[in-house]
């Protein structure tokens, strides 16, 4: 009579997420024990580990690497001279695993011709905009496009019904790529449509990050989806007892429907993103819908990732847009950034906007953990007289990172940057808007992981009507925020020391 409750209990606790967490914890404990056991009483081994740490420090000094990242590791090695060098060898390499890097580069190089720039698409841009567009198409390489309609959504629950409508209209294919997919109201609504469309013969594919979705999906998720003819790729699977490194996650949020419609932004496929579940107060996010020529960039981004792991297409032409808006609303340039190369594309786009701004730059970001170059760019823009405003969460999802974000407030405020905290809840949007003619909406946080370690995406809008829509959203959000003053930033000596340590180690958090 107790069999069913017992089965339910064990099935609940013995899921993949629980097993993974337990195995990782055991692995960490085992490594610490092994380190203690092997070094105790072995003077020669202690000396060898210290020598390794010195060599790693010298290597970092010479390495062409982000300075904040190098300093963070040098500080950690200095604090832990016995363990620091070994920790860097285990966790410090920014480059993705060789297999992952080789697969993705091979596919991207094979399809470079699919992204050939067309000068006529940028002939309406001014010199500054053309320079930025040229940079993204050269180092992305993702060209800019006219003949694209855009619609900005100031929250996830505004986007969700429109997304469902577009999914219902799909006739040829649906591509989805997300960091988080979690069972619940939002995913249930999408899944029902995907299953129905797959049964009708629509090509339905899903890429989701295995680490990001670890706690939100059942262990048999892929099997269930494949049985419904929804093909899946769990990106960079988490394998405990093989690697503890959780870097190089697929943080992108992309939907492509029939090659004609695309979505991106900060919204994942989980209930908190549409406020069907309250976690940290009201969840403020942002997304954008594109229709027309620029959708092609997102189609290629998705297919490159898909074919790196499940080779299928050599010709992307059947997935090209078949419908273009009659009128052109500015220029749109979707792009992606990845750790596959040494080009910090996402950071450079943000830096360029700050450097070229004349009147204002308004920024949404859930986290602020940046290097000196980004910090100086924010301060310099404000010192030039540009109205620089940062909007961050009032209720954090990660308290340590929230404290780290606040540790940047004093130098920014002294330079003239205005900082706001969104008091109704958690702000998860990642947007830049400047001078009524330039904006970015995407998945890219202002932290080290987004800017250097993860696969990210965004859409640059040049002189598009939705630039104004984003500006108006920021201005409507500011009255709901608390503006931070210098007097709010007083802290105790221990607090100041903690903030300094967090700043030094910020690239590692």
Describe the residue ranges of each PLM region.
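Catalytic-core elements of nucleic-acid end-processing and repair enzymes
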Residues: 430
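Helical hairpin unit composed of two closely spaced alpha helices linked by a short loop
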Residues: 367-389, 393, 398
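Short glycine/threonine-rich loop-to-helix capping motif typified by GTGT followed
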Residues: 376, 402-406
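Surface segments flanking catalytic/ligand-binding clefts of nucleic-acid enzymes
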Residues: 418
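Phosphate-/nucleic-acid-contacting segments
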Residues: 360
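N-terminal localization/anchoring segments of enzymes in phospholipid and broader phosphate metabolism
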Residues: 1-348, 352, 356, 396, ...
């Amino acid at each position: 009579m107790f069999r069913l409750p017992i089965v339910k209990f064990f099935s609940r606790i013995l899921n993949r997420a629980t097993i993974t967490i337990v195995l990782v914890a055991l692995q960490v404990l085992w490594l610490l024990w092994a380190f203690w056991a092997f070094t105790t009483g072995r003077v020669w081994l202690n000396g060898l580990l210290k020598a390794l740490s010195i060599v790693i420090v010298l290597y970092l000094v010479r390495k062409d690497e982000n300075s904040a990242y190098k300093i963070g590791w040098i500080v950690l090695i200095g604090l832990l001279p016995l363990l620091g060098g070994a920790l860097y060898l285990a966790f410090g390499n920014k480059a993705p695993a060789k297999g992952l890097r080789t697969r993705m580069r091979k596919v991207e190089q094979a399809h470079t011709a699919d992204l050939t720039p067309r000068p006529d698409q940028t002939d309406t841009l001014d010199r500054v905009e053309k320079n930025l567009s040229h940079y993204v198409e050269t180092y992305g390489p993702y060209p800019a496009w006219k003949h694209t309609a855009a619609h900005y959504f100031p929250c996830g629950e505004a986007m969700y019904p429109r997304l469902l409508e577009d999914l219902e209209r799909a006739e040829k294919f649906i591509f989805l790529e997300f960091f988080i997919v979690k069972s619940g109201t939002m995913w249930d609504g999408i899944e029902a449509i995907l299953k129905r469309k797959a049964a009708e013969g629509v090509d339905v594919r899903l890429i989701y990050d295995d680490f990001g979705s670890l706690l939100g999906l059942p262990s048999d998720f892929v099997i269930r989806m494949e049985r419904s003819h929804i093909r899946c790729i769990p990106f960079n699977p988490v394998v405990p007892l093989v690697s503890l490194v959780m870097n190089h996650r697929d943080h992108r949020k992309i939907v492509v429907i029939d090659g004609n419609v695309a979505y991106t932004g900060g919204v994942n496929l989980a209930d908190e993103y549409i406020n069907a579940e309250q976690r940290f107060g009201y969840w403020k996010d942002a997304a954008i819908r594109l229709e027309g020529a620029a959708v092609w960039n997102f189609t290629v981004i998705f297919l490159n990732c898909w074919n790196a792991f499940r080779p299928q297409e050599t010709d992307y032409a059947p997935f090209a847009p078949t419908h273009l808006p009659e009128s052109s609303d500015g220029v749109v340039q979707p792009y992606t950034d990845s750790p596959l190369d040494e080009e910090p594309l996402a950071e450079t786009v943000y830096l360029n906007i700050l450097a070229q701004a004349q009147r204002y730059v308004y920024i949404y970001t859930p986290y602020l953990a940046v290097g000196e170059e980004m910090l100086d760019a924010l301060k310099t823009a404000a010192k030039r007289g540009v109205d620089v405003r940062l909007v961050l969460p009032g209720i954090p999802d990660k308290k340590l990172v929230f404290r780290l974000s606040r540790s940047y407030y004093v130098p920014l405020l002294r330079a003239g940057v205005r900082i706001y905290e969104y008091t109704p809840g958690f702000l998860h949007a990642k947007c830049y808007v400047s001078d009524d003619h330039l904006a970015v909406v995407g998945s890219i946080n202002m932290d080290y992981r987004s800017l250097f370690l993860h696969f990210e995406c965004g859409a640059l809008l040049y002189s598009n009507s939705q630039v104004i829509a984003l500006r108006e959203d920021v201005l409507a959000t500011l009255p709901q925020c608390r503006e931070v003053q210098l007097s709010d930033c007083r802290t105790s000596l221990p607090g100041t020391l903690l903030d300094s340590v967090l700043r030094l180690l910020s690239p590692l958090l």
